Amino acid sequence: MRVGMGYDVHKLVKDRKLIMGGVEIPYELGLLGHSDADVLLHAIMDALLGAAALGDIGKHFPDTDDRYKGISSIKLLEEVGKKIDEANYIIENIDATIIAQKPKMRPYIDDMRKNIADALKIDVDRVNVKATTEEGLGFTGSGEGISSQAICSLNSVSNYIYGAADMTNCRSDCGGCMGCQNK
């Protein structure tokens, strides 16, 4: 089993959409960044890449590359999911926290979880997202920005018992792991 941790933060500014977990959230401010600045997905991607010892999102999607300017972080998460598959890991779980004073995230969390699970081709019950405030303290508490933290666990395909696995939803040519039975 491998564990990864990710963290991201972006500044809130006018004239930008607020995208969190692939969901557009109605708000007068949005996050400033090279891509759509989805801090939740950026933290999750860094956690996944870290757990697999594949670097970080800056290595794979540098902000100096115009191909990623304004790109949806859901597309980047899909690419990270492919890299995790290619490295022969299975995502066991993801647990993430959004830290924002405003707006309230609770109404959008189920959609965020679904978007993350769909992008990674995993069951939604392997993804948890929660939100908290900093009680008015710090840059998130004062409304200057939003941050996110994520942790994930991966398991190597070779750690699963091979045998008569249900290959119906298999995403790789690994030879059949029991992990696919849960899809």
Curated annotation (Swiss-Prot):
Residues involved in a divalent metal cation binding? 8, 10, 42
Family annotation (CDD domains): MECDP_synthase (cd00554)
The first-level EC class reads: lyase
Gene Ontology annotations of biological process type: isopentenyl diphosphate biosynthetic process, methylerythritol 4-phosphate pathway; terpenoid biosynthetic process
Q: Cofactor stoichiometry and binding?
A: Binds 1 divalent metal cation per subunit.
Catalytic activity as recorded in UniProt:
4-CDP-2-C-methyl-D-erythritol 2-phosphate = 2-C-methyl-D-erythritol 2,4-cyclic diphosphate + CMP
Q: Where does 4-CDP-2-C-methyl-D-erythritol 2-phosphate bind?
A: 8-10, 34-35, 56-58, 61-65, 132-135, 139
User: What are the residue positions of the site described as Transition state stabilizer?
Assistant: 34, 133
Instruction: Cite the annotated pathway.
Output: Isoprenoid biosynthesis; isopentenyl diphosphate biosynthesis via DXP pathway; isopentenyl diphosphate from 1-deoxy-D-xylulose 5-phosphate: step 4/6
Instruction: Give the keywords, sorted.
Output: Isoprene biosynthesis, Lyase, Metal-binding
Q: Does the keyword Metal-binding apply?
A: yes
PROSITE patterns in alphabetical order: ISPF (PS01350)
Q: Which GO terms describe its molecular function?
A: 2-C-methyl-D-erythritol 2,4-cyclodiphosphate synthase activity; metal ion binding
Please give the cofactor(s) recorded in the UniProt entry for this protein.
Answer: a divalent metal cation
Q: Tell me, how does this one assemble?
A: Homotrimer.
Family indicated by similarity: Belongs to the IspF family.
Main role?
Involved in the biosynthesis of isopentenyl diphosphate (IPP) and dimethylallyl diphosphate (DMAPP), two major building blocks of isoprenoid compounds. Catalyzes the conversion of 4-diphosphocytidyl-2-C-methyl-D-erythritol 2-phosphate (CDP-ME2P) to 2-C-methyl-D-erythritol 2,4-cyclodiphosphate (ME-CPP) with a corresponding release of cytidine 5-monophosphate (CMP).
Q: What is this protein called?
A: 2-C-methyl-D-erythritol 2,4-cyclodiphosphate synthase
Q: Which organism is it from?
A: Lachnospira eligens (strain ATCC 27750 / DSM 3376 / VPI C15-48 / C15-B4)
Recite the lineage of the species.
Bacteria, Bacillati, Bacillota, Clostridia, Lachnospirales
Q: What gene is this protein a product of?
A: ispF
